[in-house]
Amino acid sequence: ALETSNGIHFVAIGGDEHGNIHGNFGWVTIEGEAVDITYVADE
């Protein structure tokens, strides 16, 4: 996990039985709105 002083965060979680990597990242916009992205990295 990584979080910067300006509110950007990133988390990657190890692979599942198919080798897929799960994770999420996000930030807060200038307007104060939280943006969160969740992903699965696969082939």
Swiss-Prot record:
Biological role stated in the UniProt entry: Component of the cuticle of the larva of flesh fly.
Chitin-binding type R&R domain mapped to chain residues: 1-43
Entry GO MF terms: structural constituent of cuticle
Keywords carried by this UniProt record: Cuticle
Protein name: Larval cuticle protein SC1
A Pfam family the protein falls into: Chitin_bind_4
InterPro entries: Insect_cuticle
Transport found in the keyword field: no
Domain of life: Eukaryota
Residue ranges of coiled coil: none
